[in-house]
Amino acid sequence: DREGVTPLSTEDGQHQVKFLKSNRYYIDTYSRVDMEPKIMLKDNKGQGILELAKPDIELAYKAGWKKPERFVVKAADNITDLHGVMWKPADFDSTKVYPIISVVYPGPYFGQVPTSFTLEDRCCTRLAQLGFIVIAVSHRGDTPMRGKAYHRFGYGNMRDYPLADDKYAIEQL
């Protein structure tokens, strides 16, 4: 229930906030899998005052690292949006065909789709550099953050529930 709640940080990204003792200001650290972290000082109305720090990842880019890409596809029901992340080889050529490796975790509570920026991605970048496209898809049933029906989709079928969504997602890419 969000009635009466006003979001302070509305930028697209995963946010971590820490209010200062006075509660007049807070530090908002946010990023996305495809966007480096921003560390901002904001007032208690959400207005940005100062960028406090900016990470320097130039060496990673020079070494051939590429940001993964976010995507949205439909679930096997052809109604529900599924969010995913894709890692491509550094020398990706859109005219070529690549084998796909899909990271699937049919476990409870949270899936394996990263939402924050990281250079350590459970070997997805390394597999991409071997010539694969690697994807991670947020299957129905993997998170309670999208409501009870979405979260309980795999109830009683922990092993197989994400496979239909995963197959359908790959077919759409």
Which residues does each PLM region occupy?
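Blade-edge beta-strand/turn elements of extracellular beta-propeller
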Residues: 2-10
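Serine-hydrolase catalytic core recognition
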Residues: 9, 16-173
